[in-house]
Amino acid sequence: MACLFHWTSYLLRWYIGGRIPLGNGHETMLFLAGFLLLCTCIWQRRFSFLLPAGLLLSGFTLLVAYLSEMNPQITPLMPVLLSPWLSLHVSLIMVSYALFALMCLCSILALSIRRHAWQRQRLTLFCRVLLYPAVLCLGIGIFIGAVWANVSWGSYWAWDPKEVWALITFMLYGCLLYTSPSPR
């Protein structure tokens, strides 16, 4: 029910604003929380621990969105931010970050389980399964962000902190992907 309510309000924000609501930090955090809720709803039947964990992660994301200095108002964007490349770039990056957050939570749970080895193995396998789409979305998101930056600013890469840390994250998780055995 929370997922349905959240996505309904997100779609209303899209309708009222007349644009995809990914143009500022507040809207990006709303998308991240919504995707975490969606993942939780999809996988909670198979992994019962995911319901409280996903709701907690989504709730913290919404808390950050509403208690921070980010502007929650629906405002018109600068023309450079109205590009469909930007919406695709931001949504892919946020999807990857949501999957990484779920992986982190599952890894912490797997490390805390002492008695049941089968649960630990199941959590580890779930993390490995999440790793593939997370790295793929992050890589494609970085590439599309570079294309958007070139179209908008005239340069593919500017070495600002967001770009650098996204690249570092991609490289670290890419190494993990390269060294981990494939899921069966």
Regions found by a protein language model. Give the residues of each.
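Core alpha-helical transmembrane segments of integral membrane proteins
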Residues: 1-59, 64, 68, 72-75
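Conserved small/polar residues in nucleotide/adenosyl-binding loops
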Residues: 178-183
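A loop-to-helix transmembrane entry motif
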Residues: 23, 129-136, 157-167
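Small-polar-interrupted transmembrane alpha-helices in polytopic inner-membrane proteins
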Residues: 2-10, 130-149
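Interfacial and helix-entry/exit segments of alpha-helical transmembrane bundles
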Residues: 53-58, 117-140, 184
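Membrane-interface interhelical loops and short amphipathic "cap" helices
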Residues: 8-28, 70-91, 145-161
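Hydrophobic cores of alpha-helical transmembrane segments in multi-pass inner/ER membrane proteins
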Residues: 32-43, 93-109, 166-177
